């Protein structure tokens, strides 16, 4: 009788412990709504006398690149055979830009990623992230700021893309339909836009 009672109590304890364990289910945290943040770049942003073959940009979380064929704007433009960008189809905490051809001397280059950089978990974009460097002694410093107003609607929509085309000997009325813009930015959640590190040239601006 004593042995039976002891085993019964032991069984009851184990059963109760198991039931408690089953009822304790973990809950998820708050949804991530923040975009990735750059923590380092090598060479550093706005480097002058650039002579490297690779640029590495490090972020605070894993990122993916999305639609770089349309989103990425390199100014002055580089052909696809002149560079490679990673990651493509995978995730990483780093973006690597490998330069496969020599760059023009004394020129400021800007890599504008549009909204192609997104975090791996929730797909939050890092809007219009730019990396700039110069192969010469200075970084171009012309800055263009402005405000847009919708000509037909009472409220101007946010997140409007603004494009710049240099007005040179090759520019025509059809240029904006046939070529990607040299420079691009966005009003983000406002109606104000801002271009930086531009050479002092005349431009055609399109919203």
Label each residue range with its predicted role:
Residues 4, 20-206:
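Acidic, low-complexity Ser/Thr/Gly/Pro-rich repeat segments typical of extracellular/periplasmic
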